[in-house]
Each structure stands twice: as structure tokens, then as C-alpha cells.
């Protein structure tokens, strides 16, 4: 049974994974989301339909920059304005920050001084050390750095108060445009700053990342893996150091040589993620500490620039709010560090493995062996000492022995890069497949396998491992692959009360007889089959990743939250050393068509809606015995069937009599009359929970069943509808297992399939959102309305799909006729 914890666990170890392919070029578009223009992906048709309501396509950085230069104005970002709405969302800050542009803060402001490096990052009064540790790692790889931080920006040439940065966002690269207004207090930057007072790239990068997530407060607390992946688009592996392999130092050394990014931390005993406050520390307490800290800083010395003092003097760093726990050795629990180097040095004739780390605070350091104040430096060769100390010239960076490192630190993160990013042709590349998905409450949010009644409803992805690894030292026929499940937008939605879900996944082998059919595996399969592999546990992190080795075969991956009924979006990435194929199951949309014994005569209709319903002109269940009645008379005929009336059953005669009583002499019924006849019959079924069919539902039924465009139903049309309702009623009762008069929305998938409709996961999700109530139940009238609409829409599509290729072309009149009369 799965267990749930609130901290990460180590993945299975082995050779480090590699992400695939060349680096993608950053897309320029909407500042805070993936690209501009019309959206794509999940529910793309629905979102595209409403996209003009949300806003027009965003202008690119170049367009905005050029416009500001032409008008000779400084850019002000309307999406992330320089006011309190961009700072905190949980409560108002008691101190008034002043937003200033760099030229207003100091003389001679510079974007980058002497190249961006790890010493340019000093943490301010915000708990985002995890993000700053990732920046420090990023500065070690110039190629990656230049992609995230375009270097053609300055405060002199073509300065317009506008800057841009590029981040990976769930499969896409996005260009985030900001103005250069920064929050200050006593003329000092409140948040991240550089070691040089007049250098601003790190502060502006932090602002762009805050915009990406909606506010500065949204950056409080996180994992270095998040920042690493958003800077690279690559995959991060997570190690619990106490469970690390014996060759961990070798793994770290190899990662440094490859240019991989690494971060580490020490558990604070509260099961909180890096940079978070201890349990119980609210945002209000954090703000109070920030206020006290800034006031104390103001009293210590003046922030005014002394006359004749250059603005490029070192920044006096305000030590950030220390809700992390500082240890006697100088290390800080619950705090993120960057691993910036590894070396070996001779000490008393023996080789000692060393690790170089950096604290984003820029001040608080390790004070044990190999620290700046270490008393045994005299036992180290002078040249060796000079070489090591030359590499840690700034505050916040220090050496410690590898033994001390694994003794004190508890977690290590390694962000593995592509061969292109690593600038090496010899490194092994991995192939990748990416799938987007969504958990929808009441349909596809089934929870983990502790909940067998709903686990099977989760999204399922088929994985075909086609080729074994090339490993001459391994005789097993094995495929190595890595699965990474990432939940989307939870940090940005914090202000709406969203927190990270506890997520994980399981992998099952598909029986050979089911290979290639792409069917959604049912409840019984998971009840009687054990998983072949799974994430070690369920974790409340943005991404869960795990390395596996399985024989070539076909598998199904089931990603889920720990608890059922939790809604959210995710991406599922699969990396493998050899060729693999990963895709969502049930991606074919179709409807079972009745086998017709004779081809019906062509009928001419007066509208496109009627044309889309043309197959109802002939009874689908019994087409033999047709007479030579003309189409027009046939449509108006009061006869239930073209055959002999004497063959009618007692039920059919009763049906005809009821219909005649309601319809009158013209033998056609309108929506009001349809409502009366349906409710009159349904009310006799006390086992169906329904408040009766509404007038609007009946109007929709008429529109979807009307074969002649009259706006009414004749006997034949009504009989077809009634037979369908009776068939669907049996399906409804079959899935009403508790005889409550409703069915659980999770059962709607099977009910739809039993009715002959085959949909994909997105359509099942949409049906649940459209027809289920807040208790995830569907009553009888909603159930019938859903099936009538499916029947009508499939019939309409097939009527216009002349060549059967699954694509139709409509003009605006046809489109409006089909959608307005439905």
C-alpha cells in the first residue's frame, strides 16, 4: 500500500540520466504563461473559444522596447505593476516600500559587471534561498546562463526601463517581460541584490520569476530542483544522502565535470521544504521579522551615499530573516546551498576529498575543518592552500571535507543536462516523451491504489519499451528509463489557497493480448494485478522522479494524487536510453453505428440541422417492410412503423394513444408537450432520482432529434427518442449500484462506453464538469440529456464527414445552425 510523507525520498541510483535533444529556443509571448496567441493542449477548443475574452496576443519584448524608445518613455508593466499587489497577497505589509529604478538607486547602474557569477547573489528579506541557490548553480554554466539572461540589455544603450528573461514552463520556453522598478527601503533593495551595489541582473531576474508566479510572496519556500528545472528544462534527480550509493562523490564529481547543477540542504526536523519557516510561522510573523530586521539595519548605519563614494562599492547586505535554524558549526538547517565545486587536497600526507558550497546569504558559513578560520591550514601545502582559497574569494562560499558534507547534509539534487547543453558529443543522450494531463474531480482524480474503487479512473499512459540497453557488462535484457511526474501551476495559485498535492505513480505491465489496443484498463485489472514498479512513495513536491529497469514490453503508467477528488494539471515525462513510445490511452473518438439492412432512400431537407439528423427519417432498429410513402409524408406519418399496425404491441398502442392525446390532430409535439409526456412517464419510476426534465432540456432534445427542421417532433422522431431513453435507462440502473437514483460520476466512463460512445479522457472530464453535481453524482435527467447530446453531435458530425476522414469543414451559417439549434 502506498505511504505518504511530506519530504522527498531518494530515487534508485545508478548512472546519471541525461535529458534528450538540443536546447529549445525560448518562445516570446505572453509574459506570465507559456507563449502568446491561441492556447493549445488540454481542452484547447474550449480555451480557444474563450481566448478573445481573456485578452489579445501579448506584444513581444522587441515590440514593447521599440515602442518605448519611439515614444521616449520608460516602460511600466501593467501585468506586474510596481505596487503592493505584486508583493504580498496574504496580508498588507506595514511598511511602505518605495519602488525605484536602478538609476534612482545609485549612479552608474550596470546590468552585469564583469560577467554574471555566483558571488553576485545576496539573499534579501524573502524565504527564496532555494531559488537563489539555483541561480548560483546556473552561473557556473555560461551557455545556460545566456539563455535565461539575454545579455543584450543595459542601462545605457537604448535604455527604456524594460528587461526580459526566459524560463522553461512545463514543456515550453517563455519570455517574461518586466519593468525595472524594484522595491526598496531606505534606498536599499529589499529582496535579492548583488555583491556590487550598482549591479542589478540578479534582482531583475528574481522579479521576472516572481511575475511568472504572480507575486514575490509566491517565491517563499521551495526546492532548488524547481529553480534548476525552470532554468534548464531538464530533469533533476533527488538523493537522500544517508541512503546514497558508496560512489556518491564520484557521481558528484562527474556531474560537476558535465556542468550539471547541484544543490543541497539539511533537514530542519519539521518536514518543511527548503527555505520554509518552521511549523507555525505565518506570513504575518515573517513580515514582522522583516520589519524588525530592516529597522535594525537602518539604525546600524546610514544608507545615504557619502560624498565622493563610488556606487560600485560592495553592498552592505541585510542578513535575511533567519527562520531557518543556524547550527553551532555555522551551517543552517532548512536552508538551500549550491554545490559549486569538488577537489582533492593533501592533508598530513593523505588525500582528502573536498566539497565547495555557497550560502545565498553571502555571509553565514561553515566554521569547521577547511573553513576560512580553520587552525590546521598550516598542515596544508602553501600552493595547495593558495589554490583552494583562490576559489573562495567571496563571503558565503567555503570548503568542507566530503566526510563532513555527508555527515551534516541530508539532501542532494542534481539537475542533469542534455549533450547540447553540456557541449559534449561523447555523453549518452536519452530519448524523451512528454504527455500533458489533468486530474478532474468526479472523473479522473481517482487517488492512489489505496482507493481501488476510483484508482482505475486516473489518466493512463501506455509505455512501449522497444529496445534494450547497450551495456556489455550487463547480460540482462533490460530497458533503463526514468519517469518524472510534475504538477503544474500550484505555486502561482497559492494566493487562491492552492498547495502542492502529494503525488506519485505506479507502472503495470499490460497483458500481451491487450498490446496495442489502447483501452483504458478497468477496475478489475488493478484489483488482480500488482504493479511492476512505482514511485517509492507519494511526495508533496512539484515533481516526483524515479529511475527504473524493466524488460522490453508494453506498460501502463498511472499518475495520481494520494487522495482522490483532487483537481490539478500535470505533465508526465519519460526518459529512456533507447527508443520508447509513451502516449495517453483511449485517444480514439468514435461511436458504434447500427448495421443497416438496406440503404435508406435519399431525403431532401430544409436545414443543415435537419440534414445532420437525416438518419432518423428511417427507424434504425427495423428498416425492413418499408412502403413507398414519400419522404415528406413519411416524416409526418402518425404510423409508428411503415409496416402493419396490427403488428404493434400493447405497449406501442399505448404509446401511440398517449402521443395522440398530447400532440393533437397534427401529431407533432413541441418542447412543452415533450416535457409533459416525459415527466408523466418518468414519474412512475420511483427508483429514478429526478426533478423532472426541464423545458430547456426538452428544447435541446427536439433540436437534436428533429429531422425536418420543423422545431417539433413527430411520432416517428419521438419513438426513436423514447427507445433511446429506454435503452439508456437500463444502463443508468445498472450503474446505480446503491439504488440511490443517481450514479457516481466516476462510473460515467463505463456508462458512456456501454451506450456505444468511445471518447478520450478530455471528453470524459468535460462530461463530468458539465453534468455532475457538487457531490459528484449524476441524476437521471442530466444523464439522459448528456446521452441525447452525444447522440446528436456524433450524428451531426457524421452527416458532414462525407469522406469519413474524421474532419469536417463548415461555413459560418452551417456552424451557427448546428450550435444554436442544439
From Swiss-Prot:
Gene: CAPN3
Binding of Ca(2+) 2, residues: 706, 708, 710, 712, 717
SMART domains reported in the protein's UniProt record: calpain_III, CysPc, EFh
Protein name: Calpain-3
Sequence positions that bind Ca(2+) 4: 801, 803, 805, 807
Enzyme Commission code: 3.4.22.54
Regulation: Activated by micromolar concentrations of calcium and inhibited by calpastatin.
Domain of life: Eukaryota
Disordered: annotated span: 1-36, 600-651
Primary enzyme class: hydrolase
Amino acid at each position: 500500500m502506498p505511504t505518504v510523507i511530506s519530504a522527498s525520498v531518494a530515487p534508485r541510483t545508478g548512472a546519471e540520466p541525461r535529458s534528450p535533444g538540443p536546447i529549445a529556443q525560448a518562445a516570446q509571448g505572453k509574459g506570465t504563461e507559456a507563449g502568446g496567441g491561441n492556447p493549445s493542449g488540454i481542452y484547447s477548443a474550449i480555451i480557444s473559444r474563450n481566448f478573445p475574452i481573456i485578452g489579445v496576443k501579448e506584444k513581444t519584448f522587441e515590440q514593447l522596447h521599440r515602442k518605448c524608445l519611439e515614444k521616449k518613455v520608460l516602460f511600466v508593466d501593467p501585468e506586474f505593476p510596481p505596487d503592493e499587489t505584486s508583493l504580498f497577497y496574504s496580508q498588507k505589509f506595514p511598511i511602505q516600500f518605495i519602488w525605484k529604478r536602478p538609476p534612482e538607486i545609485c549612479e552608474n547602474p550596470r546590468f552585469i559587471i564583469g560577467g554574471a557569477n555566483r558571488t553576485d547573489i545576496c539573499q534579501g528579506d524573502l524565504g527564496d534561498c532555494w531559488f537563489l541557490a539555483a541561480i548560483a548553480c546556473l552561473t557556473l554554466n555560461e551557455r545556460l546562463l545566456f539563455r535565461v539572461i539575454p545579455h543584450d540589455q543595459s542601462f545605457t544603450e537604448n535604455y527604456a526601463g524594460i528587461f526580459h528573461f526566459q524560463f522553461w514552463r512545463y514543456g515550453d520556453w517563455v519570455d517574461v517581460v518586466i519593468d525595472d522598478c524594484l522595491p526598496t527601503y531606505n534606498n536599499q533593495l529589499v529582496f535579492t541584490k548583488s555583491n556590487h551595489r550598482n549591479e542589478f541582473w540578479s534582482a531583475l531576474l528574481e522579479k521576472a520569476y516572481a511575475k511568472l508566479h504572480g507575486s514575490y510572496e509566491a517565491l517563499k519556500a521551495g526546492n532548488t530542483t524547481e529553480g534548476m528545472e525552470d532554468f534548464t528544462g531538464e530533469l533533476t534527480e533527488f538523493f537522500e544522502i544517508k541512503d546514497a550509493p558508496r560512489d556518491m562523490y564520484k557521481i558528484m564529481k562527474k556531474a560537476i565535470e558535465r556542468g550539471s547543477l547541484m544543490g543541497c540542504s539539511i533537514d530542519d526536523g519539521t518536514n518543511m521544504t527548503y527555505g520554509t519557516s518552521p511549523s507555525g510561522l505565518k506570513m504575518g510573523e515573517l513580515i514582522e521579522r522583516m520589519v524588525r530586521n530592516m529597522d535594525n539595519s537602518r539604525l546600524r548605519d546610514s544608507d545615504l551615499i557619502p560624498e565622493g563614494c563610488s556606487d560600485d562599492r560592495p553592498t552592505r547586505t541585510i542578513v535575511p530573516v533567519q527562520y531557518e535554524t543556524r547550527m553551532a558549526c555555522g551551517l543552517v538547517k532548512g536552508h538551500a546551498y549550491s554545490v559549486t565545486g569538488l577537489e582533492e587536497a593533501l592533508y598530513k600526507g593523505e588525500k582528502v576529498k573536498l566539497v565547495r558550497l555557497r550560502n545565498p546569504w553571502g555571509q553565514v558559513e561553515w566554521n569547521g575543518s577547511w573553513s576560512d578560520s580553520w587552525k590546521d591550514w598550516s598542515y596544508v601545502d602553501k600552493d595547495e592552500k593558495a589554490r583552494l582559497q583562490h576559489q573562495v574569494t567571496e563571503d558565503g562560499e567555503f570548503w568542507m571535507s566530503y566526510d563532513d558534507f555527508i555527515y551534516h547534509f541530508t539532501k542532494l539534487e542534481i539537475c542533469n543536462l542534455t549533450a547540447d547543453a553540456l557541449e559534449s558529443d561523447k555523453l549518452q543522450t536519452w530519448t524523451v516523451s512528454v504527455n500533458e494531463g489533468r486530474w478532474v474531480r468526479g472523473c479522473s482524480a481517482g487517488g492512489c491504489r489505496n482507493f481501488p474503487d476510483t484508482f482505475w479512473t486516473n489518466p493512463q499512459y501506455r509505455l512501449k519499451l522497444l529496445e534494450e540497453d547497450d551495456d556489455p557488462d550487463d547480460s540482462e535484457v533490460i530497458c533503463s528509463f526514468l519517469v518524472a511526474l510534475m504538477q503544474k501551476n500550484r505555486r502561482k495559485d497559492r494566493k487562491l489557497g492552492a498547495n502542492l498535492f502529494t503525488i506519485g505513480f505506479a507502472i503495470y505491465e499490460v497483458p500481451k493480448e491487450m498490446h496495442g489496443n489502447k483501452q483504458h484498463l478497468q477496475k478489475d485489472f488493478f484489483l488482480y494485478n500488482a504493479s511492476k514498479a512505482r514511485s517509492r512513495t507519494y511526495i508533496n513536491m512539484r515533481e516526483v522522479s524515479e529511475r527504473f529497469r524493466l524488460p522490453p514490453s508494453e506498460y501502463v503508467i498511472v499518475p495520481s494524487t494520494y487522495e482522490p477528488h483532487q483537481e490539478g494539471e500535470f505533465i508526465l515525462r519519460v526518459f529512456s536510453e533507447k527508443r520508447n513510445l509513451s502516449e495517453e490511452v483511449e485517444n480514439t473518438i468514435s461511436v458504434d453505428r447500427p448495421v443497416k439492412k438496406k440503404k435508406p432512400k435519399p431525403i431532401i431537407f430544409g436545414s443543415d440541422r435537419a440534414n445532420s439528423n437525416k438518419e432518423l427519417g428511417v427507424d434504425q432498429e427495423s428498416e425492413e417492410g418499408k412502403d413507398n410513402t414519400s419522404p415528406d409524408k413519411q416524416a409526418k406519418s402518425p404510423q409508428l412503423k411503415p409496416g402493419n399496425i396490427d403488428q404493434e404491441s400493447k405497449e406501442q398502442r399505448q404509446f401511440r394513444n398517449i402521443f395522440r392525446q398530447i400532440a393533437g390532430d397534427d401529431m407533432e409535439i413541441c418542447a412543452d408537450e415533450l416535457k409533459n409526456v416525459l415527466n408523466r412517464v418518468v414519474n412512475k419510476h420511483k427508483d429514478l432520482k429526478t426533478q423532472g426534465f426541464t423545458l430547456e432540456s426538452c428544447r435541446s432534445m427536439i433540436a437534436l432529434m428533429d429531422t425536418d427542421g420543423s422545431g417539433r417532433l413527430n411520432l416517428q422522431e419521438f419513438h426513436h427518442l423514447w427507445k433511446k431513453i429506454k435503452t439508456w435507462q437500463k444502463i443508468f440502473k445498472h450503474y446505480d449500484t446503491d439504488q440511490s437514483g443517481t450514479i457516481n460520476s466516476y462510473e460515467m466512463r463505463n456508462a458512456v462506453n456501454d451506450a456505444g460512445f468511445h471518447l478520450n479522457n478530455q471528453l470524459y472530464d468535460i462530461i463530468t464538469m458539465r453534468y455532475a453535481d457538487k457531490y459528484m453524482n449524476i441524476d437521471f435527467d442530466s444523464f439522459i440529456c448528456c446521452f441525447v447530446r452525444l447522440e446528436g453531435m456524433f450524428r451531426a458530425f457524421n452527416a458532414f464527414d462525407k469522406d469519413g476522414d474524421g474532419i469536417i469543414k463548415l461555413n459560418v451559417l452551417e456552424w451557427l445552425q448546428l450550435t444554436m439549434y442544439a
